[in-house]
Amino acid sequence: MKISIMWMTRKRSHELIYSLSSFIMRAKDNSNVEYIVISDPDDNETYEAIEKINRMCFVHDVEIKNLVSDKRYGYEELEKYQNIVGEVFTGDCLFIMNDDVVCLNDDWDEEIRNSLKPHVENARWIGLAGVNENWKGSTTFVGINRKWYEITNRVSGNRATDGYIMTLGKKLGIEPLRPKVEMVHLQRGRETVTFERNNKRYITGGLPDDGLGGYPTKSPKPPKYYHDPNEFTNDYTDFVEGKKRFDNDFQKLKEHYAE
């Protein structure tokens, strides 16, 4: 079973490499993991950093797909990057990752495979969270399996992908698969990050606030996050269109589960 995992980022190559490396070096079978990075056309920093990693080949059988979007969408249209990746990923599942996330446990990929294998014929979504998240019952980082993508024909219908997929699952009555993948979410703007693991308490440095709330947005500040699966913008037109996309995806998935 092949796992695809993607990162969207903008001119934060240091954080991206740190995040990517933590997953690459802790995977059990990198030959069955597809690493994907997508960046903007004017973001040479990110593109060149990934090209350099690919030339180094510091772990056998690793190649990172280095994608460039057709235009700069920014955080205002974050789902566009994800849906571009959706058209080309080759794995049996796709995870959306942040560049401020570090993987902590070895064989994380095998844990995901073991969780997903019994469900390949059904559309399922996967929920992960950082060990330091305040909302540990929630799913900060989400993934979908191939069947889910084939049914909806997209990764997300709006930029709040975690909320979008989570609420689809909740409305369908489908709980997320929760593989035991331990990650720390460094969360921009925090001086320190505290978390517990294996009965030990850790304190690590956070990441500096880049003035944009950590988001690759085109506007001075990111739009308000309403935690609503149908809306992540102040534009009413986009709200209406987002609602249509959500309802359409829900109906398709509902019919799948009725079969």
What are these model-predicted stretches?
Residues 106-128:
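Conserved donor-nucleotide/metal-binding helix-loop-beta segment in metal-dependent transferases, i.e.
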Residues 124-141:
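Short beta-strand-to-loop element that shapes/binds the nucleotide-sugar donor at the catalytic cleft/hinge
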